[in-house]
UniProtKB/Swiss-Prot annotation:
Designated name of the protein: Potassium channel toxin alpha-KTx 2.15
Protein function: Blocks human voltage-gated potassium channels Kv1.2/KCNA2 (IC(50)=0.3 nM), Kv1.3/KCNA3 (IC(50)=8.3 nM) and Shaker IR (with inactivation domain removed) (IC(50)=12 nM) and blocks intermediate conductance calcium-activated potassium channel KCa3.1/KCNN4 (IC(50)=6.4 nM).
UniProt-listed SUPFAM superfamilies: Scorpion toxin-like (SSF57095)
Transmembrane spans: none
Top-level lineage group: Eukaryota
Keyword check for Cytoplasm: no
Disulfide bond annotation, renumbered to this chain: C7-C29, C13-C34, C17-C36
Chief localization: secreted
Amino acid sequence: IFINVKCSSPQQCLKPCKKAFGQHAGGKCINGKCKCYP
């Protein structure tokens, strides 16, 4: 699930993804945007 957070590395997506989807969510940075894996 893409969220509206810009990124340049996967680490930048972990906090926003966990905030949006809970502690077990993961995140990746794809084409400059965060993609979360709830």
